Amino acid sequence: MEQKFTTLAQDALSDAVQSAAAAGNAQVDTLHLADALLRQEQGVVRALIAQTGADAQQIGAEIRNALVALPSSTGSTTTKPDASRQLLAALSQAEKEMHAMGDEYVSTEHMLIGIVASAPNAVADIFKKHNVSADALRKAVPTVRGGAKVTSPDAEGNYKALEKYSVDMTARAREGKLDPVSYTHLTLPTS
């Protein structure tokens, strides 16, 4: 199974491995990946969680607390940590989510849904406590993406590009934030 990951998804996996190694954890777990996803500044995971009505900061704090509680080895180890069974199951589920959504690359949204959908794992338990299910996350994806599909490695940066780089003049007019422009000095020629 050849998986193609977006740049942000690759970064999250790399950060998860580095985090596990730095903490002396023997395995990279769903907790490490979820923490890496939530720490991404330009990522969409926090927006996805917010769309479900949950508090991404609170969930992130609970994930970090759970990470601290993981067993760690002391001393210097030169081997990098292995992926846990839960992480492998979550990544497999993420690939299924990618295919189900008609996308070409595994993105950070797929990873988060994969983690929550591949319960039981510590992250899924935290999300369940906050009433966030895989179905709720799936329903939030179109809103966060603005209807876009993941067709390139940099797809997450392109979501809602129109909203990022333009001004909705109609919305500004409704809010009374536009100055009315009068064209009464112009006369149209009549024949």
Model feature map: region roles:
Residues 1-186:
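Histone-fold recognition with a strong bias for associated Lys/Arg-rich disordered tails
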Residues 187-191:
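Short "domain-exit" segments at the C-terminal end of structured domains
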